[in-house]
């Protein structure tokens, strides 16, 4: 299995990208195609002495984070993310992994790979830590404005991913809302609720944001605006909590001594909330595996993102997504509005 890695995308490219790719290849996860500037990549590889199978596909064009995705794709047809995605389209790689611009990666996937089957809108699905292990949240940024049928399709895709890739039997799917009652929410969520209650999945109804971290819901569905806000808030909350703990610990000798006893537990907790543990987020709903990584991804995150890509390929995710029925045309009925 070959995975195309955009070696020039991300804040820490190419060094951390190459290190992560080498680590994944060394573990036998996959054969790696590093896409980027050959001279720079060879310099990095020379420092690492890779044991796995790695090849380089040269291109010196890069679409930066501050470039408009559509404009960048038009002007730089040989950019690293474009070439890496094209390798998937041509069957020369089974998946693409990138820590570059999310918007550019999405645009490249849609333009080059195309949408899956009857799916109208692709969605970014990410794992979030909970008291009962990682759960799936989607969409987290691909679509800031959605119609009810889009949320319905996100639920179908998330349900499939949770069952196939995460190995969760009969996943519990919930619709993120401002209340658990069926009549709560706006026009978007009311319409989505009516579609989902007749969907071929284990729909448990509306869930509130405060319930997410308890882990009772395996797949949480929302639009990309809300999902991205929750994701960024969660990242900031984790960082802030550990900063608060550190401040309290350093207030006295007694607290420092107590913290020493708790150190193994704190390290375990930090590992659970560390995004590098989860690697990258799949863009569901395109005709190929495209894994989107955090812009500041280090080698560990890249290695784990490649592992996510391998699992998606091994589970036949693209074919399964292409077989989904898409949103039905049933009439959406408005419920009562939230007070």
Curated annotation (Swiss-Prot):
The keyword Lipid biosynthesis applies. SUPFAM superfamilies: Isocitrate/Isopropylmalate dehydrogenase-like. Gene3D superfamilies: Isopropylmalate Dehydrogenase. Homodimer. Probably interacts with PlsY. Catalyzes the reversible formation of acyl-phosphate (acyl-PO(4)) from acyl-[acyl-carrier-protein] (acyl-ACP). This enzyme utilizes acyl-ACP as fatty acyl donor, but not acyl-CoA. Its EC number is 2.3.1.274. It is found in: Cytoplasm. Pathway: Lipid metabolism; phospholipid metabolism. Its main location: cytoplasm. GO terms for cellular component: cytoplasm. GO terms for biological process: fatty acid biosynthetic process; phospholipid biosynthetic process. It comes from Moorella thermoacetica (strain ATCC 39073 / JCM 9320). One of its GO terms (molecular function) is phosphate:acyl-[acyl carrier protein] acyltransferase activity. Belongs to the PlsX family. The keyword Secreted does not apply. This is Phosphate acyltransferase. It catalyses: a fatty acyl-[ACP] + phosphate = an acyl phosphate + holo-[ACP]. Keywords: Cytoplasm, Lipid biosynthesis, Lipid metabolism, Phospholipid biosynthesis, Phospholipid metabolism, Transferase. It comes from the Bacteria. InterPro entries: FA_synthesis (IPR003664), Phospholipid_synth_PlsX-like (IPR012281). The lineage of its organism: Bacteria, Bacillati, Bacillota, Clostridia, Moorellales.
């Amino acid at each position: 299995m070959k995975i195309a890695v955009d070696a020039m995308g991300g804040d820490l490219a190419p060094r951390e990208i190459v290190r992560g790719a080498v680590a994944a290849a060394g573990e036998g996860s996959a054969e790696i195609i590093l896409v980027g500037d050959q001279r720079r990549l060879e310099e990095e590889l020379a420092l690492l002495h890779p044991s796995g199978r790695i090849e380089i596909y040269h291109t010196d064009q890069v679409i930066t984070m501050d470039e408009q995705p559509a404009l960048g794709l038009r002007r730089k047809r040989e950019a690293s993310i474009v070439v890496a995605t094209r390798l998937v389209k041509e069957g020369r790689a089974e998946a693409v992994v990138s820590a570059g611009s999310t918007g550019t990666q999405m645009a490249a996937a849609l333009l080059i790979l195309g949408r899956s089957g009857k799916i109208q809108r692709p969605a970014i699905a990410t794992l979030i830590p909970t008291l009962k292990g990682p759960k799936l949240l989607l969409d987290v940024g691909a679509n800031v404005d959605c119609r009810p049928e889009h949320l319905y399709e996100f639920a179908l895709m998330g349900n499939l991913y949770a069952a196939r890739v995460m190995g969760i039997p009969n996943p519990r799917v919930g619709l993120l809302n401002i209340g658990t009652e069926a009549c709560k929410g706006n026009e978007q969520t009311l319409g989505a609720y009516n579609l989902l209650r007749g969907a071929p999945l284990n729909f448990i109804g509306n869930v509130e944001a405060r319930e997410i971290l308890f882990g009772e819901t395996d797949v949480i569905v929302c639009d990309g605006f809300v999902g991205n806000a929750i994701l960024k808030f969660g990242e900031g909350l984790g960082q802030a909590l550990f900063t608060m703990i550190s401040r309290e610990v350093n207030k006295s000798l007694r607290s420092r001594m107590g913290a020493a006893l708790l150190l193994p537990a704190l390290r375990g907790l930090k590992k659970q909330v560390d995004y590098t543990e989860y690697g990258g987020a799949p863009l569901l709903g395109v005709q190929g595996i495209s894994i989107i990584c955090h812009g500041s991804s280090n080698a560990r995150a890249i290695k784990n993102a490649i592992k996510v890509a391998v699992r998606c390929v091994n589970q036949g995710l693209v074919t399964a997504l292409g077989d989904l029925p898409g949103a039905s045309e049933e009439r959406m009925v408005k419920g009562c509005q939230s007070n």
